[in-house]
């Protein structure tokens, strides 16, 4: 008989680390939108470390057989890793709308979970990505919209 072996990484929930760094990035986006920062380069400089930490969380959730966490954090890790290379034009807008659609798909997938807070948070994140994508037209100000 063959023995079955499962590898589990014994750490305190990698999801929390991923959510923390995503929230940190979101605070910087909010600060840029509110005029606290005047250069969007701060987002590009912090996006790669955020992407690396979310990728680590994705690998840990995969090893812990958390398919939903892998489906949520995997595309976000790729998005944050390529964020500095997203142009400020219609292609950048489509990238943000695309990740918003991926979050909407994750929202539908998470409806099978017994916890109802996750679909709500994912839906809000999807709407935020889509609205940011529609606003992302080369750094326009509110007066030009």
Give the location of each predicted region.
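N-terminal topogenic module of multi-pass integral membrane proteins
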Residues: 1-61
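Membrane-helix interface "capping/anchor" motifs
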Residues: 60-70, 108-120
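Extended, compositionally biased regions that are outside compact catalytic cores
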Residues: 9-12, 35-41, 85-92, 113, ...
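Hydrophobic alpha-helical cores of multi-pass transmembrane domains in eukaryotic membrane proteins
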Residues: 24, 51-52, 78, 100-101, ...
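Membrane helical hairpin/interfacial module
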Residues: 52-87
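Structural signature of hydrophobic alpha-helical transmembrane segments
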Residues: 38-51, 88-100, 120-121
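Alpha-helical membrane segments in multi-pass integral membrane proteins
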Residues: 94-105, 116-145
